[in-house]
Regions:
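Outer-membrane beta-barrel transmembrane domain signature of Gram-negative proteins
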Residues: 206-224, 238-312
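Hydrophobic, lipid-facing positions within transmembrane beta-strands of outer-membrane proteins
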Residues: 100, 113-117, 147-151, 215-223, ...
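N-terminal periplasmic/intermembrane-space "pro-region" immediately following the signal or transit peptide
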Residues: 26-94
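Exposed, low-structure sequence patches enriched in small/polar residues
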Residues: 104-105, 315, 319-613
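Surface-exposed extracellular loop regions of Gram-negative outer-membrane beta-barrel proteins
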Residues: 120-138, 271-279, 284, 294-330, ...
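Flexible loop and strand-edge segments within Gram-negative outer membrane beta-barrel domains
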Residues: 138-150, 165-254
Length: 613
């Protein structure tokens, strides 16, 4: 499921409200190595293009990215980064037209719904208010609905900015992974053949119970202060409260504290980043019988001291992450309730040959927070009870290293070649639980339960890969990326493909019409099921996800009428403020395996519009 396109699938031009991302991004938790295949893949480059040092004039406009529309989620460990690097285009001849302050987007399809809203209110002198709302859902058997609303407010003072934010969200979904498989005996081969042919149809007929329908709620409020860019010492301090809850079962109360300080003199920086989270569980129902208070509180602390050099053609960041986790289930060290997990944070980028060749290296590590929210967000279909009472440890990656080159043979083509190595500890391996059933006599069948269990394994992963980015003015963009992985571990490697390929093509036919194709491919994976006695391996078929879309951009309102009557001047046309779009997802109607027993929906579509104001 994590780099991303810096243009939206629908290529919404001029959408503003960057402050929403600015403050909320700082409040985000670190996430483990987990990627999602999305219908709209939004990537942000870690390493910039080879020609990043440029004297050409550029117009930079703030944007807020609309909600990602993700319908097929796969457990691929690392998805190849499909990045649109900022290749040089024609210089700006005229002043850019005034950007829009907000947008609203809505779409309906089968079986999907989508809604987005964002508005940026800036008086030009002092306070800034950003309001946003996002909703996306697919319905039916594989229901998955995500909704989030919130606001951010910033008020500048002479030496610092004061800001606060509040948001809330809901995730509602079905644990629809019920299916049947035949046991090792039956009446005759014809019965087995009948079952193999029709077992998917039988699975769709199994009714969901209330236990299979889950709602998770989140809410957060935070306040912070940050220095303005003119200060010699840059700092940011933020504190907040958040809650993650499954009604009737458990609520996790979180206290989150961030801090960052940076002292700099010209090209040299020395600083530190600090993050602390205290989690307190409020148990309900049958979970209240858990006696040990260690089950009910978990605490995470991270500090990263660093040195950074920022030259004209070289950038170096050298730091070390020092993670300490307290609470039940810390299996990383001999003391089961305490873990200490150091990891490097080193980034290097050097422009070897100006405009056409750079080299980069990233050596990083990561330790999870160990919170219940992180536990459930990694895989919503797992058993929540186990995340509270069973000894477990957040995933720990002591090192994840990558070295690569960006090569620009000519102005519109950018190539990337990279290789890497990662050592990952306590990685989750998903297991489908089955139980005996005699619903379809005379066959003795096994019914899968909707909840997935898990165990931990240590893996090592090598990889080689690359990208091809082609950009012809504003008419064609092509991105082809892929990785091949070399896996080894203390057990067989499950839930992870040996290769991945992503292909994205955007084409502009004229100023109104544009089309795109977004595709993802991955090798087959192994999965496990457990019937209470034996583990069984299953081969999941390769993933093929093909998506396509078309959009029509137009101008409506006074700006459009004024531009038509002013065609003899050099004034640029107003930016399109209305986009109509049609998106066809998974048009091969291939139901890819997400986890064993969980398959993605088949062909589906979205028809909608975006209006910017």
């Amino acid at each position: 499921m994590k780099n991303k396109f810096d243009i939206s699938v629908y290529r919404y031009i001029g959408i503003s409200i960057m402050a929403v991302l600015g403050t909320s991004a700082f409040a985000q938790q670190d996430s483990a190595l987990n990627r999602s295949v999305t219908v709209e893949r939004d990537f942000q480059p870690v390493i910039q293009a080879a020609g990043k040092v440029s004297t050409r004039p550029a117009v930079v406009e703030t944007e807020i990215e609309p909600t990602k529309v993700e319908y097929s989620e796969f457990s691929a460990d690392v998805q190849p980064s499909a990045t649109f690097h900022p290749l040089l285009s024609q210089p700006t001849r005229f002043d850019a037209s005034k950007p829009y302050n907000g947008y609203v987007r809505g779409a309906l399809g089968h079986p999907n719904t989508l809604f987005d809203f964002g508005y940026h209110l800036d008086d030009g002198k002092k306070s800034i208010l950003d309001v946003y709302a996002h909703h996306k859902a697919e319905w039916g058997l594989a229901t998955l609905s995500k909704t989030k609303v919130g606001l951010n407010f910033t008020h500048p003072f002479s030496t610092c900015d004061l800001y606060f934010g509040v948001n809330g969200g809901n995730v509602y979904y079905h644990k629809y992974g019920h299916f049947y498989d035949y046991a090792a005996y039956g009446v005759n081969n014809r019965d087995f053949g009948m079952w193999e042919k029709n077992k998917v149809a039988y699975a769709n007929r199994q009714p969901l119970t209330d236990r299979d329908k889950t709602a998770l709620w989140t809410a957060e409020v935070f306040v912070g202060v940050k220095s303005n860019p003119k200060q010699d010492v840059q700092y940011r301090v933020q504190t907040g409260y958040a809650i993650f809850a499954k009604p009737g079962a458990v609520a996790e109360h979180q206290l989150r504290t961030h801090g960052s300080f940076d002292w700099h003199g010209e090209e040299h920086h020395v600083g530190t980043n600090i993050y602390m989270q205290n989690n307190f569980l409020q148990l309900k129902g049958n979970l209240t019988t858990i006696p040990d208070s260690l089950y009910r509180s978990r605490h995470s602390f991270r500090i990263e001291p660093y040195y950074q050099y920022e030259g004209k053609r070289v950038r170096v960041h050298v730091g070390v992450n020092l993670d300490v986790n307290l609470g039940h289930g810390q299996m990383l060290s001999g003391a089961k309730n305490v873990s200490f997990a150091p990891s490097p944070h080193i980034n290097l980028e050097a422009q070897i040959a100006k405009q056409w060749l750079t080299i980069y290296a990233n050596i990083e590590g990561h330790h999870g927070l160990g919170s219940l929210q992180e536990y459930m967000e990694e895989n919503r279909y797992r058993i929540i009870h186990a995340g509270i009472i069973e000894p477990h440890c957040a995933a720990y990656t002591p090192v994840d290293a990558e070295v690569g080159f960006h090569i620009r043979p000519y102005r519109d083509l950018l190539l990337e070649i990279h290789g890497g190595y990662a050592y990952m500890m306590h990685q989750d391996v998903w297991v489908a639980s089955t139980k005996d059933s005699v619903l379809f006599a005379p066959l003795n069948l096994k019914m899968m339960q909707g909840d997935l269990t898990y165990f931990h394994a240590d893996y090592q992963r090598g990889k080689i890969g690359g990208q091809i980015n082609y950009h012809l003015q504003d008419a064609v963009r092509i991105n082809l990326s892929g990785d091949y992985y070399f896996w080894s571990g203390d057990t067989t490697v499950y839930d992870r493909p040996n290769w991945e390929v992503a292909l994205r093509i955007d084409g502009r036919i004229n100023k109104h019409w544009s089309v795109y194709s977004d595709n993802y491919f991955a090798g087959n994976r192994l999965a496990l099921s457990y019937d209470g006695t034996n583990y069984t391996e299953h081969h999941m078929k390769p993933t093929i996800e093909l998506n396509a879309g078309v959009e029509y951009n137009m101008w409506v309102g006074k700006a459009a009428r004024k531009a038509k009557g002013d065609s003899m001047t050099l004034r640029p046309e107003p930016k399109p403020n209305l986009t109509l779009f049609l998106q066809l997802n998974n048009w091969l109607h291939r139901k890819n395996d997400i986890y064993y027993g969980y398959r993605s929906q088949g062909i589906n579509f979205l028809l909608g519009a975006t209006f910017r104001f």
